[in-house]
Amino acid sequence: MPRAKGERRLEILKALAQMLEAPKWERITTAALAERLDVSEAALYRHFASKAQMYEGLIEFIESSVFTLANRITEDEANGLRQADKLVEMLLAFAEKNPGMVRVMTGDALVGEHERLQARMNQFFDRFEATLKQSLRDAADGDAAGRAATLLRYAIGCLHQYAKSGFSRKPIESFSAQRRYLMT
């Protein structure tokens, strides 16, 4: 029985994400991806017009997953500081559960790819910072923008450290210990 087109696309994206999880990561070629899936490169291009489109699929997964959870947090938690705390924790937990996506989020996997991909990840982080700022608008010190920027930069630093350590330095572990310094 033939597979549905969407099923094969998902299989390709999962394989790409798994390849990005390798601790000693190297740039991924379509030839290596095709070999991993035991298909021809032409078969990949029947589902995606370019490798950039494959990365866009991963970025869409990141955006959809993170902002669905962010919306849930902002709806369920009334306190702005607790919202911000939970938002950062959620982003770090997402990264820990999806190490291949961290390579995309930090831009490592996007080096040498189409520049619109990095621009899209930059937009993702701008949107996440805006979500933090909205949560912190009633913070005691009144500097929602400064607090949001600090929290975002902390989270991005954790993502980089996680990727550079070959995924051994878990971002949630450090956040659990450091949240009291960040959230006061």
Where are these regions (language model features)?
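Hydrophobic/aromatic residues within well-ordered alpha-helical segments
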Residues: 8, 51, 58, 62-66, ...
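Amphipathic alpha-helical segments enriched in hydrophobic/aromatic and basic residues
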Residues: 20-23, 29-30, 41, 51, ...
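Amphipathic alpha-helical packing segments from all-alpha helical-bundle domains
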Residues: 64-67, 114-139, 146-149, 173-180
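Short hydrophobic/aromatic patch on the recognition helix
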Residues: 38-48
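Amphipathic C-terminal alpha-helical segment
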Residues: 94-97, 101, 151-170, 181-184
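Hydrophobic alpha-helical connector segments
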Residues: 57, 71-97, 144-151
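Basic, helix-initiating cap at the start of DNA-binding domains
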Residues: 1-36, 53, 65
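Amphipathic alpha-helical segments used for helix-helix packing
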Residues: 95-116
